[in-house]
Amino acid sequence: MRTLLISLMAVGLFAASSCVNEGGQVFGELPEGVVPGSGEALEARGAVYNKDLNELKISWRTTPDPKLYKGVEVSFQALGGQSKTIRIMANPNFSSSYDYFTVVTKNPATVQYRCIWNKESGEEVSEWASADNLTVTNVASSDVFFDIVPPTFKLVTEDNVSAQVAEAYDGIVGKTDEEKKAYYTQILQIVLSSIYNSIVDAGQQPVSWIKCILGKMDYPGAVAYVSGDSEGPLMRLSSEYVEQVSTGAVSMEDATFEIRGVLIHEFSHLVQKTGAVGSNQPSCIEGMADAIRSACGGVTDANRISGALNAGVYYDENRKSGDTPCPYVWQMPYGTSGYFMNWLRTYDGDFLRKMTITIEKMGSQWSLEKAVQYILGENYKMEDLWNEYIEDAKSENVG
């Protein structure tokens, strides 16, 4: 399957007169008057569905003439169940936007798309094509990043951890050292797959060494955090939280979900780009980590919806004070901006990967607003997007 995955991902698109699947089925002729650059038919190579991220990636066979190809219009069922019709435009800022497009959905069969073409007299579109007619390969993030070199793990259980707590910990992350290392590696793989396209982008060994500690927390109420000591990076997991499992105060199911989500957030800090952005842009650091957590399925729907509906007013002068001014709600850290950034994948399934590129590219000039316009286009206004995000959350809350 890995060979098939690599071949599916290393494809492009050529300019064309119709949309067809691998079997040659024609979905729609281009409108009269559109002259394709190569005279060939526009053909979808196939599709890859990442079940961890709910991402359907449809790749074209050969790269099109950028003078003719403008992008695709896509109709699909969004993660919240809403029916959406959006445009994913070819963007010169990202050459890959001419090779494929990505849709975030739990129901790939609902995805329909039509090509948008440039013409002297105006814009033309093809007829609708259905992803349901494509060959879809289902993958996990571990398939995409199967060839990373895992970190060297140092596993530590502190002496003050009781046997009962250690046993509960084993039930969540694995009984043997090898099982624990595999668990942490899978967390790292899903984080990497949410913000990087490939190991080439992320690096062969993005994290070379990490100490994973089960012990008491320095910060009351925290479940886990990532820091460092003289040996290098470390991740500390709360034995107090795990103790609630051993006493029955927290179910094993809830603890397993929560610990996975927290570790996704913390491992994000090991591999995310921060560049010259600095801590005065909390949405870039803590917001991004929660965006990754949400994208990777580490947040309950109830918490995600509540985070949107209780985010506060769109603009508040009182939030201008302090070292990290956040007058706009989408500037705020953690889930307030993070769940919104994850929702922006509605408009481009590669949004978080492209945002990683903007963080490196823009450095100290980065802002979420600039990143959105760089990725989606200047016609996308933050307040309009935020309002739609809140309306989607309200529709889910009613449902």
Segments (PLM) and residue ranges:
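Beta-strand-rich modules
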Residues: 102-123
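Pro/Thr/Ser/Gly-rich low-complexity, intrinsically disordered linker/stalk tracts
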Residues: 23-67, 124-142
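Auxiliary, metal-adjacent structural segments of Zn-dependent hydrolase domains
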Residues: 174-240
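Solvent-exposed loop/turn segments flanking beta-strands in beta-repeat/beta-sandwich domains
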Residues: 63-83
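Zinc-dependent metallopeptidase catalytic helix centered on the HExxH motif
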Residues: 224-307
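Pan-zinc metallopeptidase signature
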Residues: 331-399
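C-terminal motif of bacterial Sec signal peptides marking the signal peptidase cleavage site
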Residues: 15-18
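Solvent-exposed serine/threonine-rich low-complexity stretches and specific carbohydrate-binding patches
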Residues: 84-94
